[in-house]
Amino acid sequence: MTGFLGRAQGLGRLGKILEQAGKPRVRGCALASVSVLSLVVMSVAARAQPTGGSVVAGSAQISSSGASTLINQSTSKAIINWQSFSVGQGGSVQFNQPNASAITLNRVTGTSTSVIDGAIRANGQVWLLNPNGLLFGNGATINVSGLLATTSDIADQDFLGGRYNFSSTGGKGGISNSGSITASNGGSVVLSAPSVTNKGLIAASAGHVAMTGKVWRS
């Protein structure tokens, strides 16, 4: 899969996972303990949707109707900065992308945790970057070509240039999954934060799943 998992050396079990994926370099990783994750989650309306979306690179159109948000992307990569990115129960976010290797980078610039309790669907890859943390609730159903959920960040030009060097934001947010995350055949799922908890289902047939600690720029 053309994507975000990459070559790494001397990282034990995680390093082997990344070696098998054979994509960009990440260093300074450690497997996160699957422990109780403390997330201070702000009250989110039952039908909350992403807000304040601004396309800062690539070509994409954002439209919303009720509890549904649609992103039509026509370039292989796009960057969207959001004030907040949550999906309430019964809500959905649909990404229509050129192909399975296309990537939409969604960066939260506000101060709230992303609470996903609805559906995210994409025929390509979805990256969710939020230094405040991400919570996939019991109602979350994610069906994508590939998913990266992280509290780290990446420079726009690095992302666009295929240099997938992530840096810590210094935030204390974590990631918790109690829902269902599915990557298409050969796809990958990566959850990366200071602490990561998985109590749900993560499936990546013939692909890779990784839960990592802090990811530092190489």
What is each stretch, according to the model?
Residues 2-218:
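Solvent-exposed adhesion/ligand-recognition segments of exported proteins
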